[in-house]
Regions:
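Structural signature of extracellular appendage/secretion-system components
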Residues: 1-540
Length: 540
C-alpha cells in the first residue's frame, strides 16, 4: 500500500523537465522574472510578467494540495473497502466454524472446510494482523471427554476479538463531521472505525499490521507532530452569542507548536483529549508571552463546545494532565506533506510581503502585499495586515501576543487557498521596487532584497535550507519513504514465498514423485494381474 501511494507522491512532486514542478516555476519567478525587473524596475511589462510568474507559483501549490487531497480521499475509501472485507471474511469464517463443528460432532474430520477456513485466514492476515486459537470443547458432564467440536477464535490488531465460534463482531466506518477534524488540511469525511457494539476500534494500534496499517499511516501520518502539551488552567468565557463556554489552557513545549507557521490544528473545531477524557472544542487562540528575562511561554487556550456535545463539563482536576489532539504517528503521510507546503508558503509569504510593504512603488505609493489566501466561505481574501498579531515581530521582553484561530494571520494561508492579492493582480504597478520614496523610479534596491530571499538562508530558512531548496527537502522525504516501502515489500514478498514453499513441501503435490509412484503402482498392478491369470490357468 505504501509503495503504491509513495510512487504517486513522487510523481506529483517530481520536476524532471517533462513536468513543470516547483523548481521550474520558482526559478521563473525569482530568476527570469526578477532579472527582467532588475533591468527595468518600473517597467509595467516586467512587473506584469513577474506577477504572472507569482500567480503560477500559487497555482502550483493549489494543484499540489488538490492532488494530495485526492490521494487522501482514495486512501480513505480504500480503508472502508478493507473494513468491509474484514466483515465479509469474519462472517464466512464464523459460518465455516459452525459447519465444521456440525460435521466433526459426528466423528468425521471436515478437512475440506478446514482448508477453506485456512485460506480465509490467510486473506484476512494480509489486511490486518491476525491471531488464531482453537481449543476443544469439553463435555459439561464429563470433563475428561471431548465432544469433537472446537472453539475457534480469531483476534485482530493486538488481541481484539473478531470471531468467536459461530459469532463474529462486525466493524463499521463512521465519517468524521467537519467539527471532528484533526488537522487543518484534512478532507471532510475521514473514517473512524467502530465495533458493531459501539466501541471504538483503535486504528492507531501498534499491532495493527497488514494493508490497513499502511493505509492509516499514509492517510494520517504526521511525522510524530500531533498537538500535545500540559493543561495549566481551566476557566470560562462568554462567546459572541452570549453563551458561556468552558475553556482550557494548554502549555506547549514542542518547537513545531510554538511556531504558528508550522501549526496544523483544525480551524473548524475538533476533539481534544485531556487526561484520557475527550472534549469537543469550537475554537482556540495562541499566546506567546515573554517575561522580563526574555523567557517565552507558549500556550493555546481552547473554547470548549456546549453541553450538547460535552455533557460532562470540564473540572479543575484536568490541570496538570496531558492534553493531546490526534495521534502521534511517526510516518510521513499526507498531513505531513500538506503541512510542509503550508509552512513554506506561510514563511515565504511573510518574508516576501514584509519586503514589499517596507518600500514604495514607482508612483511613490507605499508597497502592498503580493501573497495572500482566499477565504473558503466568501469571495474575500485574507488581509494579513494586523501587526499586533505578528508574534514573530514582538519584543523579546515583557510582551504578549495573542492570535485567535479566525484572525487574519498567516496561519490561515494554506496550499489550497494560496493566491495573489486581487489588487496586485489587477494592477501590477502597485508592486514596490525601491526602499525610499525619494529615490528615482529606476531604483531597484528593494528588488535585490527580494532576489536574496530565494538563496540567502539568513533571509528565509526552511528546514535549514534556503527558500529555493524546498523541493529538495520534500523529494528527499518522499524518496526515503518510497525506498523503505520498496524494501519492505521485497522482504515481505520473500518471506511470503518461503512460507508458501514450506506449505507446499508438506501439503503440496510433487509431480516427479507422483509420476514415480504411478509407474510403481502400474507395475504392481501388472504383476498382480499376471499372477491371477497364472493361478486361474492352474485351477482350470
Amino acid at each position: 500500500m505504501k509503495q503504491y501511494y509513495m510512487q504517486q507522491l513522487e510523481t506529483y512532486f517530481d520536476d524532471d523537465g517533462k513536468s513543470t514542478g516547483f523548481k521550474t516555476i520558482f526559478d521563473q519567478l525569482m530568476i527570469t522574472g526578477m532579472q527582467a525587473l532588475l533591468k527595468d524596475p518600473n517597467s509595467a511589462t516586467a512587473k506584469s510578467q513577474f506577477v504572472g510568474y507569482a500567480g503560477a507559483l500559487t497555482e502550483y501549490f493549489n494543484g499540489m494540495a488538490g492532488n494530495l487531497e485526492k490521494v487522501q480521499k482514495d486512501i480513505n475509501q480504500e480503508i472502508k473497502l478493507k473494513v468491509d472485507q474484514i466483515n465479509s471474511l469474519a462472517g464466512e469464517i464464523a459460518s465455516l466454524n459452525k459447519q465444521i463443528n456440525t460435521i466433526e460432532l459426528a466423528g468425521t474430520k471436515a478437512n475440506e472446510l478446514r482448508d477453506r477456513r485456512t485460506l480465509l485466514i490467510d486473506e484476512l492476515s494480509k489486511i490486518v494482523d491476525v491471531e488464531v486459537k482453537e481449543t476443544p470443547i469439553i463435555d459439561a458432564n464429563n470433563e475428561n471427554r471431548e465432544t469433537g467440536a472446537n472453539r475457534y477464535m480469531v483476534k485482530i490488531a493486538g488481541g481484539q476479538m473478531l470471531v468467536d465460534g459461530s459469532d463474529y463482531n462486525g466493524l463499521e466506518c463512521v465519517a468524521r463531521t467537519s467539527y471532528e477534524k484533526v488537522n487543518q488540511t484534512d478532507i471532510d469525511g475521514l473514517y473512524e472505525v467502530y465495533w458493531a457494539d459501539g466501541q471504538k476500534f483503535n486504528l492507531y494500534n501498534a499491532s495493527m499490521g497488514g494493508d490497513l496499517a499502511g493505509l492509516i499511516q499514509m492517510r494520517d501520518g504526521n511525522n510524530g507532530e500531533n498537538f500535545t502539551g500540559q493543561v495549566t488552567a481551566t476557566g470560562t468565557t462568554t462567546t459572541a452569542d452570549g453563551k458561556t463556554h468552558d475553556t482550557v489552557t494548554v502549555k506547549v513545549t514542542k518547537a513545531y507548536l510554538q511556531d504558528l507557521n508550522k501549526c496544523n490544528l483544525s480551524d473548524q473545531g475538533g476533539i481534544i483529549d485531556l487526561g484520557n477524557q475527550e472534549f469537543y472544542y469550537d475554537s482556540w487562540e495562541y499566546t506567546c508571552e515573554y517575561d522580563a528575562n526574555g523567557n517565552a511561554t507558549y500556550t493555546y487556550t481552547f473554547t470548549l463546545s456546549d453541553s450538547e456535545k460535552n455533557p460532562r463539563g470540564i473540572t479543575n482536576d484536568r490541570v496538570g494532565k496531558k492534553a493531546e489532539i490526534g495521534t502521534d504517528l511517526s510516518y510521513q503521510g499526507i498531513p505531513y506533506y500538506m503541512n510542509q507546503m503550508n509552512e513554506w508558503i506561510r514563511t515565504f509569504s511573510q518574508k516576501f510581503n514584509d519586503i514589499l510593504t517596507s518600500g514604495y512603488s514607482g508612483s511613490g505609493d507605499p508597497g502592498v502585499k503580493m501573497f495572500t489566501g482566499n477565504k473558503a466561505t466568501s469571495s474575500e481574501q485574507f488581509l494579513l495586515d494586523d501587526a499586533a498579531k505578528r508574534y514573530d515581530k514582538q519584543e523579546k521582553k515583557n510582551s504578549k501576543v495573542t492570535v485567535k484561530v479566525n484572525d487574519d494571520s498567516y496561519y490561515r494561508l494554506t496550499a489550497k487557498n494560496f493566491d495573489i492579492l486581487d489588487a496586485m493582480e489587477q494592477d501590477p504597478s502597485l508592486m514596490a521596487n525601491r526602499k525610499n520614496a525619494s529615490d528615482g523610479v529606476e531604483q531597484n534596491d528593494l528588488l535585490n532584497d527580494l532576489k536574496n530571499l530565494a538563496t540567502d538562508k539568513s533571509k528565509m530558512s526552511f528546514r535549514g535550507c534556503n527558500a529555493s531548496e524546498f523541493l529538495q527537502c520534500i523529494l528527499s522525504d518522499v524518496a526515503l519513504n518510497a525506498s523503505r516501502a520498496n524494501t519492505f515489500y521485497a522482504s515481505f514478498k520473500d518471506i511470503s514465498a518461503t512460507i508458501d514453499n514450506q506449505r507446499i513441501s508438506i501439503s503440496g503435490v510433487d509431480e516427479d514423485e507422483e509420476a514415480v509412484n504411478l509407474v510403481k503402482y502400474q507395475n504392481g498392478y501388472n504383476l498382480a494381474s499376471k499372477m491371477i491369470q497364472t493361478l486361474t490357468a492352474i485351477y482350470d
